[in-house]
Swiss-Prot record:
GO molecular function: DNA-directed RNA polymerase activity
Family the entry assigns: Belongs to the RpoE family.
NCBIfam families per record: RNAP_delt_lowGC
One Pfam family recorded for the sequence: HARE-HTH
Gene Ontology annotations for the cellular component aspect, listed alphabetically: DNA-directed RNA polymerase complex
Stored InterPro entries: Asxl_HARE-HTH, RNAP_delta_N_dom_sf, RpoE
Gene (UniProt): rpoE
Keywords: DNA-directed RNA polymerase, Nucleotidyltransferase, Transcription, Transferase
Function summary: Participates in both the initiation and recycling phases of transcription. In the presence of the delta subunit, RNAP displays an increased specificity of transcription, a decreased affinity for nucleic acids, and an increased efficiency of RNA synthesis because of enhanced recycling.
Record keyword Secreted present: no
Domain HTH HARE-type: 14-81
Protein name: Probable DNA-directed RNA polymerase subunit delta
Originating species: Limosilactobacillus reuteri (strain DSM 20016)
Amino acid sequence: MDLKVFDGQDKSELSMIEVAHAILAHHGKAMAFVDLTNEVQQYLGKSDEEIRERLAQFYTDLNVDGSFISLGDNTWGLRAWYPFESIDEATVGENEEDEEDDRPKKKRRKVNAFLADTDDDDDVIDYDNDDPEDEDLDTDDDADSEDDYDDDTDDFSDDDDDLDDGIEGQLSELHDEEDEDEDDE
């Protein structure tokens, strides 16, 4: 196949997307992805291994590039062939808008965030101290609580000084001979 669009250009510098666009324009009709890929491979002279390595990126590029359109059943065409009004593509959020048009619209109430809703007291924070559960029951008990405990500190003596040093007593200081020589001088 000879594509006049690429006359005088090095085939190794062409992208698969550019070649696919030229092939679709040359044929003038939609093609299956497999057939399109085979023709791109033949035109570029790439090996099966090279095409397999680049196949996922090529498919992604077809989807992302705005000049191609998927017609279903893995068939691809050029978007320029189809008038804008005739294209029936699913877009994000399109179904949601259709569903909203069919449903009757609810009236929305204005909500004042600063007014307490009397029906739903769970969300209201009560800052008043007039509730019996808010009373602090321990106000007078703090002074009496010290008398409830015995002073157990008398049971301990200062005999701890007579005990072995534990691991600290087993440690010895290390001195380098060089340090001792310097100390002697």
